[in-house]
């Protein structure tokens, strides 16, 4: 029996809570575009991060191993996954997938990707991550490339915009609390 390879796109919205996304039942319309993607694809209903912060949690997601097995226990490039533990992109590449990533961070998750479009942090930059619009633009270019090259592909798209510091652009800056955000009675955050 021949196994069909489906294309896989894994979106990671760093620090976004599923219970605040409308596709997961939140009563406010907070994620209309993601809702449309979710209607056409697969959604995980019970998915929990095994560790914080980002690097250990995502390494577990990419290896299927706990932090005590892969040894990424902190938020630094000083930590590398244990040699010999395959990353998801490596496994899929061995199975015939081409692998692409549009990441908001540096090269934390680059192992196993044929094309990894990361972002090098700079102390001169006012924010140390790539804006979502840029990640989306990079991802769409990679998607065009993947389709043109043909065959099955895996793409990892990693957004950081919802991460601290919380500076949403207008009009979203007042979507949940329209009064003085310094008011001690403000319990919206």
Predicted regions and their residues:
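Catalytic domains that recognize anionic headgroups
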Residues: 1-189
